[in-house]
Amino acid sequence: MTQISERFLVQAHLDAKQPKALSPEEQAHYRAAIAAELKKQDAVMVAHYYCDPVIQALAEETGGCVADSLEMARFSNNHPASTVLVAGVRFMGETAKILNPEKRVFMPTLEATCSLDVGCPVDEFSAFCDQHPERTVVVYANTSAAVKARADWVVTSGCALEIVESLMDNGEKIIWAPDKHLGRYIQRETGADMLLWDGACIVHEEFKSKQLEDMKALYPEAAILVHPESPEAVIELADVVGSTSQMIAAAQRLPNKMFIVATDRGIFYKMQQLCPDKIFIEAPTAGNGAACRSCAHCPWMAMNTLERTLQCLREGGNEIFVEPALIPNAVRPLQRMLDFTQAARLRQAGNA
């Protein structure tokens, strides 16, 4: 299975670097100009929780949304705007286009990818699936349009447990891709029969259980929130394991005043916005410097800058295109996910 080269990761960090930090006045100029372009072009901006805070704030103040990948997809699908600007990584832009082929979809950069996507090339994955034709193919949203088109179901970390549990109840055996840590977590929680692809997120794989234990000893009153893309030893230390939205909800719900958070630090913008009286601490990674591959912030998410956002709107560049032949097969597993989660919401509302 495909391994991510260190050279590729280094290049991602270099590409994410700003030539210079923007002053508050420059930031205000870019934000006003982007807001005007969005209005002029009948466009709405959706941003992921892992983008830099200034990008998340811009999406909110222009009538867009900041969300996890599931809600980004749902919002893009339901919003009446004719153009969608996706601040995130490439698979998110592709997902918006698959669900809205009639809309124009742009991204600040097309170079913003994902180690999970890159580590699951469609030719290798299709060959793997062909070896096990009796199994239901479930892929994480962090995959290319071509891989989604090979799948029976697409899931996010927010709905993966429930969907796999439902498939297991139907007696189905599963191929899971690409995140092995999330796959193992689901396997442990559900007992499902799953064959796992060997992929990992460069951010979450860096969290270390020993250092997390040491940090917990320093802050015994803190609750530990962990994303399920993290290694098993880190997950075992968690008070709450969940998707980005589930972690944010836990921060609001739990009485703790302090939280140690094992996910991309971009999420702190929304956590601090919703819980201004609480303290959030980054869970420890391999450490800063040469030993640190992500330092708890995705280098590709960091490529979504104000300059690139304005440039893409003004020049009409970085438009997302998905091969038309892929769309019918790719939309099917995505729509299954949206239908399943919508039905679950209605059931939950009925039981409230």
Curated annotation (Swiss-Prot):
Give, as one word, the top-level EC class.
Answer: transferase
Gene Ontology biological process terms from the UniProt entry: 'de novo' NAD biosynthetic process from L-aspartate
Which is a Gene Ontology cellular component entry for this protein? cytosol
Give, as in the UniProt entry, the pathway in which the protein acts. Cofactor biosynthesis; NAD(+) biosynthesis; quinolinate from iminoaspartate: step 1/1
| Record note on cofactor | Binds 1 [4Fe-4S] cluster per subunit.
- What's the chief localization of this chain? cytoplasm
For this entry, the protein name equals Quinolinate synthase
